Amino acid sequence: TNSHGIFSLNYGARLSYWSWNKEWLFSPRVSLGIIPSFNEDFTFRIATGLYYQAPFYKELRDTVTTGVSTKVRLNRNIKSQRSFQVVLGGDYKFKLMNRPFKFTTEVYYKALSNLIPYNVDNVKIVYYGGNIASGYTTGIDFKIFGEFVEGTDSWISFSLMKAQQKVDGKSFPQATDQRYNLNFFFSDFFPGTTRWKMTLKASIAD
């Protein structure tokens, strides 16, 4: 805390070892939060870190088809999928109809490497069994949260996103790619009592 505001710094790291492929993983992360002295209704955040996701069994399987025969082996040279992430965000607290509300915005970028791509065929998912792809995920999120009805919380969120991957020099959307997502959660009490509550959820995405 100083004349410029309140600062909050959090940092840490995780060290792990995977015996299957004898892989050591070091995952540092750090975040900084600031409540400026000129207006304590604002909060600003920045966070970054390096994250890993170890493969599960289906991602280890490397399938090779020769003629009419198919061989499956478990890839001992496979690596954990890696994501370097940066997030910038902010909150603004305000009053509306004399009730508390909060508006939140976050912008993020994730640089992805050592990806294990997969194909989706109806309900069947087939993994390539190797770290042959890279990519990125980026987007911006907006959310307004508060008491649209006094005494109970509701919120509306809207996200713009893009997720791409590159395999053999060719770029295309990831299977999880969405361009927008609108979510709505509303709660209200039954007339004359606060013991009974009704909630309504809706989501639109593409």
Briefly describe each language-model feature range.
Residues T1, L25-R29, T43, R73, ...:
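Transmembrane beta-barrel architecture of outer-membrane proteins
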Residues T1-D41, T65:
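Signature of Gram-negative outer-membrane beta-barrel scaffolds
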Residues N2, L15, I34-P36, L50, ...:
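Residue-level signature of outer-membrane beta-barrel architecture
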Residues N2-S3, F7, Y108-A111, G130-D206:
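Gram-negative outer-membrane beta-barrel transporters
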Residues Y11-L15, L32, I46-L50, G90, ...:
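Transmembrane beta-barrel strands of outer-membrane/channel proteins
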Residues N21-S27, Y57-T63, L115-V123, M161-P173:
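Outer-membrane beta-barrel translocator domains and adjoining extracellular loop/strand segments
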Residues S37, D41-K95, A205-D206:
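Outer-membrane beta-barrel translocator/channel fold
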Residues S37, N77-Y136:
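Membrane-embedded beta-barrel scaffold of Gram-negative outer-membrane proteins
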